[in-house]
Each structure stands twice: as C-alpha cells, then as structure tokens.
Swiss-Prot record:
It comes from Aeromonas hydrophila subsp. hydrophila (strain ATCC 7966 / DSM 30187 / BCRC 13018 / CCUG 14551 / JCM 1027 / KCTC 2358 / NCIMB 9240 / NCTC 8049). The keyword Mitochondrion does not apply. The gene is astB. The keyword Flavoprotein does not apply. This is N-succinylarginine dihydrolase. GO terms for biological process: arginine catabolic process to glutamate; arginine catabolic process to succinate. One of its GO terms (molecular function) is N-succinylarginine dihydrolase activity. PANTHER family: N-SUCCINYLARGININE DIHYDROLASE (PTHR30420:SF2). Belongs to the succinylarginine dihydrolase family. The active site is at 174, 250, 369 (nucleophile).
Length: 445
C-alpha cells in the first residue's frame, strides 16, 4: 500500500477583493481598498496546483464559498430583493457588505484540521471544519466548508466528519494553519503539533497585547479529543505572543513541518526548548530535523513580509523534499540568501521552487495558506471524489471556467452591483457540476 500527502488547494472565488478585513494580518491591512483581479488570482492558484502535479504530486481542489452571503445580510436587517439588500448595505454598512463578499475561503489551511488514519483510534481520516470565530467574514464559512468537505471525502468507511466547535472565542479555532504533523513516513503514526495563541479559561497565561490570538489552547485540545488522538500523538505548543503582535496571526506564518522536518523561526514559540523536547520524545526513534532560522539571519519582519514560513514543504516522488515559496521570498535579499544556504545544509530539503501567488499574498495568504494537507493511502485516495483531483483535463476545464465567469478587476464600489451576485451564482452552479459536488451552496438548496 502506498502512502502520500495530498494538497487540496482552495479555488479563488469570483468576488476576490481587497477590503482589509483581517486585523492582525499586515498584508491584508496594507493593501485595503486596492482594486483586485479575481481572474488572475484564480489562475495563479490553478497554475500552482498544476505545477505541483508536474512535480509528481497528487493535487486536489476545494470549491470556494457562495459570496455575497445575502442570507447573513438579511439576518442583519437588510430587506427586499437582492439589489435592494446590496444597495442598503452599501449605503448603511459598507464594511459589513465587504465582509459578506469576502473570498477568504480560498485559504483552505483555515478550512479544517485533518488527522490521518495512522493517528486516529478508529483508523479513519478525521475532519473538523474551523469555526474561525475571530473574524466576522470568516465566521460565515464553517457550515458550507463542512458540506464541501463531505462532498469531496464522501465515504463513511474512510472519512469521519465532525461539526465545527462551538461558535465562541473561548473555542476559537483556525484549522490547519495552527497544526502540523511530524512522522517518519506518511503511513506511520506521527506527532500532531497544535499551536495556540492563548488559553481562554486561564487568563494568567501569557497572551499578545496588540493583535488577537485567534487559536485557543482549549480549541486545540477539543480537536485532539474529537479526532481520537492519544496523549502520545499530540503536543500543544504556545506561539510566542510577541510575534503575534508583530503580525504573525497564524503559526503557518512562522513555522511549517513535513514528515521529519520542522522549519521554524527562532522566535516562533514561547517555550521552545521544552516544546521541542516533548516533540522529540513523542516522535520516538528515527531522524528528526529541527531547522531553526536565527533572527540574525532573517528578522520576524522579513519572515512576515516574504512569507518564508508560509511555504509548502513537499516530499517529492524521489524522496527528497522541496520548498514551494512565493516569489516574494526570492525578491527579499535576506530570505533569498537564507534559502540558497538552506539547500546546502544537509537536511532533507534539497530544492526551492518559486511561484507567483501575488493576488493572494496582497491579501495576506501565501502558498501554505492556499492548501489543506491530507495524508492518505491509495485506498483512501480511491474513495475521494475524483472530480476534485487535478488532472490535465480538469485543469483545462477549470481554467476555461475562470475565463468565462471571472472579472479582471474588482473595486470595492463594484460590490453594490447586483450583476455580480448573478455572475457569482452562475459560476458556482457550473462549478458544482465540474467538481460533482451536488447542491452545496445555499442558493441551490
């Protein structure tokens, strides 16, 4: 039986825009109110997916959410037909309208937390959609995220789908962006690292002062319980509050892991030595590489600006590892110099591939934000909805679909246009047929 990791990337939705909705996400705030290019954003994402298949990887795709979320606008008191709801919201609450138009579901690292069958008590892959309570625009996602995941992983024998955690900041959960897994091989049991920003029920614990800690210890513990992870399979590590206050809003902005490699910044964690000692103990026998990037070589500011740690580390079919990095890493002198050195250090990472995902980067999401990792075996892969796996023909279908339905410019003023609602629904209705998802969207039900 073969074992591997499959990346399921989020397809950028037709309403991709720069509204600066994410407080604590420096790039999102810095690019607020610029015009976006939804067509180019979607194509950049698709090209990244296609590039990974060309490296020999199995690559999946997850559909975007229906936006605007008119049901939420109506729940907030805007009435009448769709055009009337948009006009009222644009006039009375433009920030709320922008939030209900957000295409943030493209960052599928926040879609869910996934535990592979090698780690779970019942031998199934477990999924829990993230509740994303900390940001209003993202808190609208979990219900439909769950539907999409069930349509992609639609086999009770191999996949177990949980409801998202209670919708309260005490159990604030941001999904796989604060979770990584270390293992000797994908098919062997591993150690799942849950990184949290604060404890909700013990306010004596350290917490950031400037920006919010979006993930709580209690949420991470609940996910581990739901997924049936034993004590030997889970490590809970607090993120350094000081780096959250410097714009590190998720752990995947300051650390990333794959198999027996943990790649992280010197300032990433609060009690680094004890945390890594626990990881090493629970990892057990076998080579384990901790690659710590010193502040003297790459500052936190450069790490955030370039998204050095929001890269993907892939194990290629050859067995060597490679980093998928945004072109911003190549353009940053300190980060570029570090990556050039990294591939010579004798770790499993032997190459770096740069990819252009600028439309996503300007909204605060790099290559790792755009993907949800699922470690699986070939039997489990055979149970995945095949229309949600990228092949040459499916790539061509999706690329053509983007050409037919997406605008090449979207400004905040355009969000009041009722035609955008129909364009988006027409596009998504066709997409559910291409991806064979069934009726996952509210307008289809």
């Amino acid at each position: 039986m073969k074992h591997f990791e499959v990346n399921f990337d989020g397809l950028v939705g037709p309403t991709h825009n720069y509204a600066g909705l994410s407080y604590g996400n420096v790039a999102s705030q810095n690019n607020a109110k610029e015009a976006s290019n939804p067509k180019e954003a979607a194509k950049q994402g698709l090209r990244k997916m296609k590039a990974l298949t060309e490296l020999g990887m199995t690559q999946g795709v997850l559909a975007p959410q229906e936006r605007p979320d008119l049901a939420t606008l109506r729940r907030l008191g805007f009435t009448g037909n769709d055009a009337s709801v948009l006009a009222q919201a644009a006039k009375q609450a433009p920030a709320v309208l922008a939030a209900c138009y957000s295409a943030s579901s493209m960052w599928t690292a926040n879609a869910a937390t996934v535990s592979p069958s090698a780690d779970t008590q019942d031998g199934r892959i477990h999924f829990t959609p993230a509740n994303l309570t900390n940001k209003f625009h993202r808190s609208l996602e979990p219900e439909v995220t769950g539907r999409i995941l069930r349509a992609v992983f639609n086999n009770d024998r191999h996949f177990y789908h949980h409801q998202h955690l209670p919708e309260n900041d005490h159990f604030g959960d941001e999904g796989a962006a604060n979770h990584t897994r270390l293992c000797r091989a994908y098919g062997e049991s591993g150690v799942e690292l849950f990184v949290y920003g604060r404890s909700a029920f013990d306010v004596s614990q350290p917490a950031p002062k400037r920006y919010p800690a979006r993930q709580t210890l209690e949420a991470s513990q609940a996910i581990a319980r739901l997924h049936g992870l034993g004590d030997e399979s889970a490590v809970f590590i607090q993120q350094n509050p000081d780096v959250i206050d410097q714009g590190v809003f998720h752990n995947d902005v300051i650390a990333v892991g794959n198999q027996n490699v943990l790649f992280f910044h010197q300032q990433a964690f609060l009690n680094t030595a004890s945390a890594l000692a626990e990881v090493r103990t629970k990892f057990g026998d076998g080579e384990l590489h901790f690659i710590e990037v010193p502040t003297a070589e790459v500052s936190v500011q450069d790490a955030v600006k370039s998204y050095l740690f929001n890269t993907q580390i892939l194990t290629l079919p050859s067995g060597e590892m490679a980093i998928i990095a945004p072109t911003e890493c190549r353009d940053n002198p300190a980060v570029s110099a570090y990556l050039t050195k990294l591939v010579t250090l004798g770790t499993p990472i032997k190459g770096v591939h740069y990819m252009d995902v600028k439309q996503s980067m300007r909204n605060g999401g790099g290559p790792a934000c755009l993907r949800l990792r699922v470690a699986m075996n070939d039997t489990e892969l055979a149970a995945v909805n095949p229309a949600c796996l990228i092949t040459d023909s499916q790539f061509a279908r999706l690329d053509g679909w983007v050409d037919r339905h997406y605008r090449d410019s979207l400004a905040l003023d355009d969000l009041r246009d009722p035609a955008l609602v129909m364009e988006s629904r027409t596009a998504l209705d066709e997409l559910t047929q291409i991806l064979k998802l069934g009726s996952v969207y509210p307008f289809q039900r």
